[in-house]
Amino acid sequence: MDLIPAIDLMNGKCVRLFKGDFNKRKDFAKEPHEQAEFWEREGAKYIHIVDLDAAKTGSPTNDKSIKKIAKTVNIPIQIGGGIRSQERIEQLFSYGVEKVIMGTSAIENKELVKDLSNKFPGRIIVGIDAKDGKVSTRGWLEQSNIFATDLVKEFSSFKIASFIVTDINTDGTLEGTNEEFIKSILEITDIPVIASGGVGSISDLLSLVKFENSGLFGVIVGKALYENKFTINEANNVLSAERLNDIDLNTNYYA
């Protein structure tokens, strides 16, 4: 299980939202490409990017930052936010992006996801953002009556790379993950799952290690890294396979 640092973009800046609320936004000083480069030096194996402006409006406005990140780092980039067409996906791939995340478009046009996952096998990720178990769309501004678990079951027959599942109620809180939600997803799919939302400490990371053998591939972390709750190097030490035997999951510490 890998830690995947997150860069959320608004107006070309690194930001974090609290529970997905655009009115509760915190800006960070580093330029996005500088932040990505720093995390690569710290030992990140991937970079996760969300274009929040595009997620909200459907129109990409942060391509300059995305291109610069792709040119700056030598590790794979996955990106989501407002990706709703094959043309947009091909454009992002041309920038050097490795994988794309389809969220709103996946829910509104399942056949498109099926076609694109066949055309680009292993490069399409389905992002499912949920509040109280039900899916939210359009940058979390619209709430549906669709259960996240139902969507996961439906998409599990497609040739997608992974699911990214975000619990909106914990996102940006630093108060811990929703383990029951993560478990409910892992129980119904054989496709790798990446969890997002709520990690605020090394203990929170340790609590997820037990899900690795059930298909938890990675965990996305943003605010905790920006606010220096722990470093990527510390996280990698916890999550690396060779340290699993040293971890006491009952007391949440590692030797």
Curated annotation (Swiss-Prot):
Entry EC no(s): 5.3.1.16
Protein's cellular compartments: Cytoplasm
Keyword Electron transport among record annotations: no
Record has Metal-binding as a keyword: no
Protein's pathway: Amino-acid biosynthesis; L-histidine biosynthesis; L-histidine from 5-phospho-alpha-D-ribose 1-diphosphate: step 4/9
Keywords assigned by UniProt, alphabetized: Amino-acid biosynthesis, Cytoplasm, Histidine biosynthesis, Isomerase
Single GO BP term: L-histidine biosynthetic process
SS bond partners: none
Main localisation: cytoplasm
Protein name: 1-(5-phosphoribosyl)-5-[(5-phosphoribosylamino)methylideneamino] imidazole-4-carboxamide isomerase
